[in-house]
Amino acid sequence: MKSRLFIISQYLLPHHLLSRLAGCVAECRARWFKNAFTAWFAKRYQVNMNEALVEDLTAYEHFNAFFTRALKPDARPLDETPGAILCPADGAVSQLGPIEHGRIFQAKGHSFSALELLGGDPALAAPFMGGEFATIYLSPKDYHRVHMPLAGTLREMVYVPGRLFSVNQTTAENVPELFARNERVVCLFDTERGPMAVVLVGAMIVASIETVWAGLVTPPKRELKTFRYDEGSRAPIHLEKGAELGRFKLGSTAIVLFGPEQVKWAETLGAGSATRMGELLAVPVQA
């Protein structure tokens, strides 16, 4: 009954209004508030501040600065397996596996369209049909910056407007097409393993999504918008393996896609496996 009421509330709540309010709270600079709230949050979720570049909770200008905190340079060593594809974020594997018949597995009884996830452009989605996906959920206690699984050159970014359902096991099992309905930012890269997509999916009270090349991604009118980076006079944007790609200001999920016969997921990983940025996510399929 509790789960059913929770799901009903997800459809009734004003997602974007709540997220804007959460964003205002998270950016509050009043020392008495931001210090108390940050201390409560760090204790409630057992955040490990020993690995943070700035360990003093009171040194952050607001809660969002704490939430998107940088780590010490040696906190996340990169896996040295030849050709390793790295975990892009701290968190847990929600699901991973093949993209079958254009669908990505969400939870028992549910899948979602890879085409819709990527914004609805068949040409953009075609290289990933029959490929592989990994969905990684970032919990409140996790480090909330997302990094490159593999070195790549940015080709395209697509902002896809949508709802902001909460993302957790309950919603994954009960909200159809969850990740293809929530607001998201799709980042397309050319890599040595062919096209790679990293999709940053928003959720309830996720105030914003940022990328290192565009900053805050919030197009006017919240309409679907495509940004091309492989044409015109602008210099190519190349990011090395392990480099920061973007960050969540509160919450959610990163989904990584590769084309067919390009990668094989690490045998140690499965649904529910904990991940740390820089650890082995996959190895290349040998030609």
Swiss-Prot record:
Post-translational events: Is synthesized initially as an inactive proenzyme. Formation of the active enzyme involves a self-maturation process in which the active site pyruvoyl group is generated from an internal serine residue via an autocatalytic post-translational modification. Two non-identical subunits are generated from the proenzyme in this reaction, and the pyruvate is formed at the N-terminus of the alpha chain, which is derived from the carboxyl end of the proenzyme.
Record-level GO cellular component terms: plasma membrane
Site feature location: Cleavage (non-hydrolytic): G251, S252
The keyword Membrane is annotated on this UniProt entry: yes
Major site of localization recorded for this protein: membrane
UniProt keywords, alphabetically: Cell membrane, Decarboxylase, Lipid biosynthesis, Lipid metabolism, Lyase, Membrane, Phospholipid biosynthesis, Phospholipid metabolism, Pyruvate, Zymogen
Pathway(s) where this gene product acts: Phospholipid metabolism; phosphatidylethanolamine biosynthesis; phosphatidylethanolamine from CDP-diacylglycerol: step 2/2
Reactions mediated catalytically: a 1,2-diacyl-sn-glycero-3-phospho-L-serine + H(+) = a 1,2-diacyl-sn-glycero-3-phosphoethanolamine + CO2
Highest taxon, organism lineage: Bacteria
Membrane topology: Peripheral membrane protein
Pfam family, one: PS_Dcarbxylase
UniProt GO molecular function: phosphatidylserine decarboxylase activity
The keyword Acetylation appears for this protein: no
E.C. no: 4.1.1.65
Enzyme kind, highest EC tier: lyase
Cofactor section: pyruvate
Gene Ontology biological process terms from the UniProt entry: phosphatidylethanolamine biosynthetic process
Family: Belongs to the phosphatidylserine decarboxylase family. PSD-B subfamily. Prokaryotic type I sub-subfamily.
Record text on subunit structure and interactions: Heterodimer of a large membrane-associated beta subunit and a small pyruvoyl-containing alpha subunit.
Function: Catalyzes the formation of phosphatidylethanolamine (PtdEtn) from phosphatidylserine (PtdSer).
Name of the protein in its database record: Phosphatidylserine decarboxylase proenzyme
